[in-house]
């Protein structure tokens, strides 16, 4: 359990204390990643099934790595090689996999609400690895962990989220989590890529990039979610990059010296971020990837019923 939760589906559901429970444990889990032998017996005998209906590099490999470091058995399932291609429904697929008695189902799906639907029909814990444009809770948690690690705290800090906010499940999870940890959130992007009503969550909305990043402690850059966009919402990527992309000159002129830059990946280099910025000293993007393993270890440990001090044994 994470606090009162059997599942990890949306950070909208999580309290400040529950978010801190995960990232505090992740700090301990990260120590395991620094060891020569990256293996602990915490979830020996447990099974984690990764159920991915959408392409993924970082998230699926991160959950698989997290499970294996904790000594759990990990089964990777992809829709292209399954009975889904023969017309099997999501619920039937999940129930058949659950009949194999896994302890945790990790699911990514293009439809918002899919993990919650699955959770209503299975007895094991369910973790959302991203559902449509709804949420991506483990990414939100690893962003919280990375920011706390780099900034010391989120209390009183300002985070700017820039790009295709409307179609970004990462932005939604971050927007639900950051204010609970005391951070102020600014959203910036084209008006056509800004969801309605985000002000009620405490965020301020900007269309001017310089204004949005002025004095920010961290900037999270988002890619354009072409796969979720029907009609064109911007004139073109070149024009988008000129207005909302972050290059070395803008970073040097507009960002304060201590500001760090994050990106959930994959990066469209030369669009939202120039290579010089993505690979530069402000970037903590690869730290996010490493921290993602630690955070997902913490999630699996808490939900699969890891015992005692074995997490750090």
From Swiss-Prot:
EC number: 2.1.3.2
Top-rank lineage group of the source organism: Bacteria
One Gene Ontology CC term in the entry: cytosol
GO MF terms held by the record: amino acid binding; aspartate carbamoyltransferase activity
Reaction equations catalysed: carbamoyl phosphate + L-aspartate = N-carbamoyl-L-aspartate + phosphate + H(+)
Stored InterPro entries: Asp/Orn_carbamoyltranf_P-bd (IPR006132), Asp/Orn_carbamoylTrfase (IPR006130), Asp/Orn_carbamoylTrfase_sf (IPR036901), Asp_carbamoyltransf (IPR002082), Asp_carbamoyltransf_Asp/Orn-bd (IPR006131)
Keywords: Pyrimidine biosynthesis, Transferase
Ligand binding (L-aspartate): 86, 169, 223
Signal peptide: none
Binding positions (carbamoyl phosphate): 58-59, 108, 136, 139, 265-266
Pathway where it operates: Pyrimidine metabolism; UMP biosynthesis via de novo pathway; (S)-dihydroorotate from bicarbonate: step 2/3
GO BP annotation list: 'de novo' pyrimidine nucleobase biosynthetic process; 'de novo' UMP biosynthetic process; amino acid metabolic process
Enzymatic class: transferase
Record has Transferase as a keyword: yes
Protein purpose: Catalyzes the condensation of carbamoyl phosphate and aspartate to form carbamoyl aspartate and inorganic phosphate, the committed step in the de novo pyrimidine nucleotide biosynthesis pathway.
Subunit text: Heterododecamer (2C3:3R2) of six catalytic PyrB chains organized as two trimers (C3), and six regulatory PyrI chains organized as three dimers (R2).
Cited NCBIfam families: asp_carb_tr, PRK00856.1
Family statement: Belongs to the aspartate/ornithine carbamoyltransferase superfamily. ATCase family.
Full protein name: Aspartate carbamoyltransferase catalytic subunit
Gene that encodes the chain: pyrB
